[in-house]
C-alpha cells in the first residue's frame, strides 16, 4: 500500500487563493518599506552555526534547526559526547550549519562582511522565510516568513519614531484598525534590576517579566524565585505590577520607581522623546502604549523594544516586534555600530485579516476571460485574441482541449472566471466574438475592440 503523503508539523502548503492573499500583504509591506527609503537585500537560508548560536539566549538556541554535516557525519562525531549522551557537545561535532532563526542576526553578519561596500546609515528591508523548532499552534509555525526593516549606523531616536510610523502606515494600508504598538526600553528593565540589586540576573529577570501576560503576576514571581531572585527584591518590584494609566501616567510612575537608577532614567527620557514626537504627528490606525513588562527575551536589544498586538477582538499573539540593538554587530567584530529594526509577522497578520474579513475581493481575482475551445481552427482564432488581450494586461486563457462545452463552462465556473468567449465558425467568418457573462448569462456579439473594452 502506498504511503499517504504528508508534510512536517508546523509547515503548510498554500492554495492559489492563499498565495494571492499572502502576496497582497507582502506587496503592501514592501511598498511602505520602499516609501520609507529602505533597500532590499537577501541572505542564505542557512548560516554557519557559529553565526547564530549564542545570539538568542538559551531558549532561542534550543529552537534553532541544526543541519547535519554532509557525508558520514558520525565518523567525525565526538565519541565521548556520543557515549555520554551529551547532546550539546555532540551537536557541535556533527553540525556546522543551521537554518536561520530570524533575519536580524544574518543582517548583522551581512553588515560586517560588506561594511566597505555599504553607505551608512544603511536602511535595509528583507522578506524571506525563517525556521524555528517551536511547538506548532495557532499562528505559530516552524517555517514562516519574516518581513524586516532595519537601520544601522545611526543612534538617532528619530529612527524609533519612524518605525512607529512605519507600523502605522502598513496597518493603515491593510485597513487594520485597533492595533497596539507596545513599547518599552531595555534601559528601563536594567534600571529595575539595578534598584532591586539584581543586576547579575538581568536576563533571568526580563525573561520572566516578559511572560506576565501568559502566566500572570504570581507565575512571574514564582519563576523569578526559581532563578534565585530574593523575596526582598520581589517586594521592591511590586510597583511594576501596579503600574497603569495612559502613557504619561506610566512615565510618571516609572520616574518614581527608577529614581535611584541613572540607566533607568535615561530609558525614560528616550521613551518620552518618542511619545512626544508621535503626539506631534498622530498615528492613523494604531495606538502607542507603554508596557514596562515587555522584555522580548532576546540578548541583543539595548534600547527601545517594540511589540505589536492585534486588535482586542482578535485572539492572537504579537503580529510584529523589534527594537534597538547597539551591540549586535560587535559580536562579529564591528564595534560602535548602533542599529534598530522591526519585523512584521506575516502569518499572524494573514489570520487577523482573514478573521476580520479585511482582504479586498480583488485580491483573489485571477483569469478574467476563458475562450472556449471548439477545435483546431477555432483555437487558433481564439489564441490570437488571447495574445492581444494579454498585451493589454487582460488576463485571458484558452481552454487547452476541445472538450464538451459543458465541461469547459463548468471549469470556468469552478475557477470563478467571470467571462467566457465563444468563437465558432460563424464568429470567425464575421470577425466577431460572443462574450458571455457567467453570472448573468448575458451575451454580446463584439469585434475585438468591443471585446477588449468590455473586459477592461
UniProtKB/Swiss-Prot annotation:
- Protein keywords: Aminoacyl-tRNA synthetase, ATP-binding, Cytoplasm, Ligase, Nucleotide-binding, Protein biosynthesis
What GO molecular-function term can you cite, just one?
histidine-tRNA ligase activity
Q: What is its EC number?
A: 6.1.1.21
Catalysed reactions, semicolon-separated: tRNA(His) + L-histidine + ATP = L-histidyl-tRNA(His) + AMP + diphosphate + H(+)
Keyword set includes Acetylation: no
One GO biological process term? histidyl-tRNA aminoacylation
Localization (cell): Cytoplasm
Entry GO terms, CC = cytoplasm
Note whether Zinc occurs among the keywords: no
Which family does this protein fall into? Belongs to the class-II aminoacyl-tRNA synthetase family.
Indicate the quaternary assembly.
Homodimer.
The entry's protein name is: Histidine--tRNA ligase
What gene name does this entry carry? hisS
Amino acid at each position: 500500500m502506498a504511503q499517504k503523503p504528508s508534510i512536517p508539523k508546523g509547515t503548510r502548503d498554500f492554495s492559489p487563493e492563499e498565495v494571492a492573499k499572502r502576496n497582497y500583504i507582502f506587496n503592501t509591506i514592501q511598498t511602505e518599506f520602499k516609501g520609507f527609503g529602505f533597500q532590499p537585500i537577501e541572505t542564505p537560508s542557512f548560516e554557519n552555526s557559529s553565526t547564530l548560536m549564542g545570539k538568542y539566549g538559551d531558549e532561542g538556541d534550543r529552537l534553532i534547526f541544526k543541519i547535519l554535516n554532509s557525508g558520514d557525519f558520525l565518523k567525525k562525531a565526538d565519541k565521548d559526547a556520543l557515549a555520554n549522551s551529551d547532546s550539546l557537545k555532540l551537536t557541535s561535532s556533527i553540525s556546522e550549519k543551521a537554518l536561520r532563526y530570524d533575519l536580524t542576526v544574518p543582517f548583522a553578519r551581512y553588515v560586517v562582511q560588506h561594511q566597505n561596500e555599504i553607505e551608512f546609515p544603511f536602511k535595509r528591508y528583507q522578506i524571506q522565510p525563517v525556521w524555528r523548532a517551536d511547538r506548532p499552534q495557532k499562528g505559530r509555525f516552524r517555517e514562516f516568513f519574516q518581513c524586516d526593516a532595519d537601520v544601522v549606523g545611526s543612534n538617532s531616536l528619530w529612527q524609533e519614531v519612524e518605525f512607529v510610523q512605519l507600523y502605522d502606515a502598513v496597518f493603515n494600508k491593510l485597513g487594520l484598525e485597533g492595533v497596539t504598538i507596545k513599547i518599552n526600553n531595555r534601559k528601563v528593565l536594567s534600571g529595575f534590576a539595578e534598584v532591586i540589586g539584581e543586576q547579575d540576573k538581568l536576563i533571568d529577570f526580563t525573561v520572566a517579566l516578559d511572560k506576565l501576560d501568559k502566566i500572570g503576576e504570581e507565575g512571574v514571581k514564582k519563576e523569578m524565585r526559581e532563578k534565585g531572585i530574593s523575596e526582598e527584591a520581589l517586594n521592591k518590584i511590586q510597583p511594576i505590577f501596579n503600574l497603569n494609566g495612559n502613557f504619561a501616567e506610566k512615565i510618571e510612575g516609572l520616574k518614581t520607581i527608577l529614581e535611584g537608577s541613572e540607566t533607568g532614567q535615561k530609558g525614560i527620557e528616550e521613551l518620552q522623546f518618542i511619545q512626544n514626537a508621535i503626539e506631534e504627528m498622530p498615528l492613523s490606525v494604531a495606538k502607542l502604549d507603554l508596557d514596562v513588562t515587555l522584555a522580548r527575551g532576546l540578548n541583543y536589544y539595548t534600547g527601545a523594544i517594540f511589540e505589536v498586538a492585534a486588535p482586542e477582538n482578535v485572539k492572537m499573539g504579537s503580529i510584529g516586534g523589534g527594537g534597538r540593538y547597539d551591540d549586535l554587530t560587535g559580536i562579529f567584530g564591528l564595534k560602535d555600530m548602533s542599529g534598530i529594526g522591526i519585523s512584521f509577522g506575516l502569518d499572524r497578520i494573514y489570520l487577523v485579516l482573514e478573521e476580520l474579513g479585511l482582504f479586498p475581493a480583488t485580491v483573489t481575482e485571477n483569469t478574467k476571460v476563458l475562450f472556449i475551445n471548439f477545435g483546431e481552427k477555432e483555437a487558433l482564432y481564439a489564441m490570437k485574441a488571447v495574445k492581444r488581450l494579454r498585451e493589454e494586461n487582460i488576463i485571458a486563457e484558452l481552454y487547452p482541449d476541445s472538450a464538451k462545452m459543458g465541461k469547459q463552462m463548468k471549469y470556468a465556473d469552478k475557477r470563478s472566471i467571470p467571462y467566457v468567449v465563444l468563437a465558432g465558425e460563424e464568429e470567425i467568418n464575421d470577425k466577431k466574438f460572443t462574450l458571455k457573462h457567467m453570472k448573468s448569462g448575458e451575451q454580446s456579439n463584439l469585434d475585438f475592440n468591443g471585446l477588449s473594452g468590455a473586459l477592461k
